[in-house]
Amino acid sequence: MLDLKRIRTDFDVVAKKLATRGVDQETLTTLKELDIKRRELLIKAEEAKAQRNVASAAIAQAKRNKENADEQIAAMQTLSADIKAIDAELADVDANLQSMVTVLPNTPADDVPLGADEDENVEVRRWGTPREFDFETKAHWDLGESLGILDWERGAKVTGSRFLFYKGLGARLERAIYSFMLDEHAKEGYTEVIPPYMVNHDSMFGTGQYPKFKEDTFELADSPFVLIPTAEVPLTNYYRDEIIDGKELPIYFTAMSPSFRSEAGSAGRDTRGLIRLHQFHKVEMVKFAKPEESYQELEKMTANAENILQKLNLPYRVITLCTGDMGFSAAKTYDLEVWIPAQNTYREISSCSNTEDFQARRAQIRYRDEVDGKVRLLHTLNGSGLAVGRTVAAILENYQNEDGSVTIPEVLRPYMGNIDIIKPN
């Protein structure tokens, strides 16, 4: 959530930045007018309360002097009614301000490229060379079926579209991948966490999913709980409403969890395969850092995600998202896109973001500076390290052989009982 004080004192700069995120000028003007109205009401309330205090003192003095105080009593009653009306109006203004500010996206960092959509994202670097096949490649969903490791038909029967069963070596491959990822992140200083897979509405507000993106989630009927869309939500909210000792920062968390998404607005997109599901596993990285260190930590986090792809020997590229393509809470985001041969393109497999103090303000996550003792908002970062199902898809397609078998990447073999190949049934 943006700081109202910052909006007030630096309105033109904030308005210009938010315009690059698609926020219209009318919304910003209304916000400014509401804030001015709020300050005017606060002044009126203070003045009326001061006058009421004077009237109250005059009544007390009149009673001590055994004088008639009817005029002062009437004046105080009028002032009390005025104060009640001002307070009611102020409550309405505060509610309107709060509802507006909570749906405003974060402002982009100064070095984020300007752009309306994904077509204006900027490529930063590439790693690896896409393999040249001397046979016709298959898509991962066809490979999974022919290998007997992915069952889409029964997933649809048991639940519905965008669900599947992993079985046999498919299940082992999935487990091997996320175990490998967690072990790699542990080497980089991340503390592994098994979080709740359901959270409350306050947690969803804290990380920015609520109230704006409620339709993208699965809420449990007649319950205060929501199925997590990503482990970012419980991990970030771990310190909600807390003050952390500054000496402990930065703090690194990692977790593997299922993620549940309604994929509202995705009808017709990626209807086959592992790219877009209602339920999928993802290894998440979350960091809590001091403001002056957060962008250095973003580079490290992105490198941690890249490390996984490099050890799996999967070609990828890193792009900086433009202002119009960034997520709601992000101030800056790097996407990692892995090469998918059957689609002859790169597809997102990780997104690493610095939200600066945007989530910390919503969730009231603060730290006490060890030098001056002051309490300040910290910065939160989050990143996929990686999306497990998409990693399965990338491995199946990049490691496929002409006979329909799939070679297991060397780093995963110790996690699969040294199996080195998955062959068709």
Curated annotation (Swiss-Prot):
Annotated L-serine binding sites: T230, A231, E232, E284, S384
Keyword Cytoplasm: yes
Binding site for ATP: R261, S262, E263, E348, I349, S350, S351
GO biological process, alphabetically ordered: selenocysteine biosynthetic process; seryl-tRNA aminoacylation
Spans through the membrane: none
Class of enzymatic activity (EC top level): ligase
Location of this chain's protein in the cell: Cytoplasm
SUPFAM superfamilies, sorted: Class II aaRS and biotin synthetases, tRNA-binding arm
Keywords attached to this entry: Aminoacyl-tRNA synthetase, ATP-binding, Cytoplasm, Ligase, Nucleotide-binding, Protein biosynthesis
Known pathway: Aminoacyl-tRNA biosynthesis; selenocysteinyl-tRNA(Sec) biosynthesis; L-seryl-tRNA(Sec) from L-serine and tRNA(Sec): step 1/1
GO CC terms of this entry: cytoplasm
Superkingdom of the source species: Bacteria
Gene Ontology molecular function terms on file: ATP binding; catalytic activity, acting on a protein; serine-tRNA ligase activity; transferase activity
EC number from the UniProt entry: 6.1.1.11
Swiss-Prot/TrEMBL catalytic activity: tRNA(Ser) + L-serine + ATP = L-seryl-tRNA(Ser) + AMP + diphosphate + H(+); tRNA(Sec) + L-serine + ATP = L-seryl-tRNA(Sec) + AMP + diphosphate + H(+)
Family under the similarity heading: Belongs to the class-II aminoacyl-tRNA synthetase family. Type-1 seryl-tRNA synthetase subfamily.
Subunit structure: Homodimer. The tRNA molecule binds across the dimer.
Function in brief: Catalyzes the attachment of serine to tRNA(Ser). Is also able to aminoacylate tRNA(Sec) with serine, to form the misacylated tRNA L-seryl-tRNA(Sec), which will be further converted into selenocysteinyl-tRNA(Sec).
Record's comment describing the protein's domains: Consists of two distinct domains, a catalytic core and a N-terminal extension that is involved in tRNA binding.
Name of this chain's protein: Serine--tRNA ligase
Species, as recorded: Streptococcus agalactiae serotype V (strain ATCC BAA-611 / 2603 V/R)
